[in-house]
């Protein structure tokens, strides 16, 4: 986290949010997945989230880098399936909860298990993977109010197989619009994720047409050197779609 802050300062960013992943492999009362008879182990390796260590390191970074606004955060995976577990964990972050809460989808139910998106490309045609993904993403948006920002809208696009030909957003316009309509209706925000292939200005136009009023920028870094990566290009795309800087340099970009 210290190195990420160093990179943020070097990149000229006014602030950074550390949105660590929050994924679950067990469930409790109130978690929908408990009634679905699904194997939830969608990744070969998952590590415990050290909330105490995270918060202590966050405080240390704030002391070291007073010129940065350093926000707490979390990225909840499949929040619609683990509503109770996710809510209980978020509450441990202290009064008011994390500054930023992202919602994301990395895996979908398939043949009795929660299956990671990249595995699905080995089991069905690429277009079917995307349609299955968007259908589950819509269930996430409609089925969870825990998050503020929807992360990496078309996550499996990162793994789109070359053999399937170029990825065309227009081929999935109906699916994109369904998700964007639901997200806008809930008055939440869309992330422009610079680790994924950048959303086009046209797709961000669909977000505007759905009633979306704001976007956030996320480098989805995972490594310090990626903090702020491609933000200048992302700004160009977002501006082309009509969004502008918000009330101050820390705000979301808005219409």
Label for each model-derived stretch:
Residues 1-7, 81-91, 132-141:
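Short, acidic/polar
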Residues 75, 155, 250-252:
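Residues that form or immediately flank small-molecule/cofactor binding pockets and catalytic motifs
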Residues 1-80, 158-170, 178, 222-229, ...:
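An N-terminally biased module of ancient metal coordination in phosphate/nucleic-acid-related enzymes
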Residues 10, 56-66, 87-102, 141-145, ...:
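Acidic (Asp/Glu)-rich catalytic clusters
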Residues 29-30, 85, 114-115:
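Short aromatic-enriched loop/helix-cap "lid" or pocket-rim segments at secondary-structure transitions
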Residues 16-18, 70-74, 101-103, 149-151, ...:
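Hydrophobic faces of well-ordered beta-strands that scaffold small-molecule active sites
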Residues 1-6, 163-255:
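Charged catalytic cores and adjacent phosphate/nucleic-acid-binding surfaces used
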Residues 22-25, 81, 96-181, 190, ...:
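Divalent metal-binding pocket/active-site signature
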């Amino acid at each position: 986290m210290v190195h990420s802050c160093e990179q943020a300062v070097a990149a000229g960013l006014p602030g950074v949010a550390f949105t660590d992943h929050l994924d679950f492999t067990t469930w409790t009362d109130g978690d929908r997945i408990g009634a679905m008879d699904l194997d939830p182990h969608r990744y070969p390796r998952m590590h415990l989230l050290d909330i105490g260590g995270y918060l202590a390191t966050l405080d240390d970074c704030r002391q070291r880098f007073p010129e940065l606004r350093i926000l707490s955060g979390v990225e909840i995976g499949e929040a619609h399936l683990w509503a109770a577990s996710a809510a209980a964990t978020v509450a441990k972050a202290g009064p008011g909860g994390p500054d930023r809460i992202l919602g994301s989808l990395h895996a979908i139910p398939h043949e009795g298990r929660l299956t990671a998106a990249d595995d699905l490309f080995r089991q069905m045609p690429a277009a079917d993977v995307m349609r299955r993904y968007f259908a589950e993403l819509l269930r996430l948006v409609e089925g969870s109010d825990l998050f503020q920002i929807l992360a990496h809208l078309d996550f499996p696009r990162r793994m789109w197989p070359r053999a399937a030909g170029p990825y065309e957003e227009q081929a999935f316009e109906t699916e994109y619009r369904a998700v964007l309509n639901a997200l806008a209706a809930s008055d939440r925000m869309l992330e422009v994720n610079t680790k994924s292939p950048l959303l086009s200005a046209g797709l961000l136009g669909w977000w505007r047409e759905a009633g979306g009023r704001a976007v956030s920028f996320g480098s989805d870094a995972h490594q310090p050197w990626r903090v702020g990566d491609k933000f200048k290009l992302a700004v160009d795309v977002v501006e082309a779609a009509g969004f502008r800087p918000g009330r101050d340099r820390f705000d979301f970009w808005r219409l």
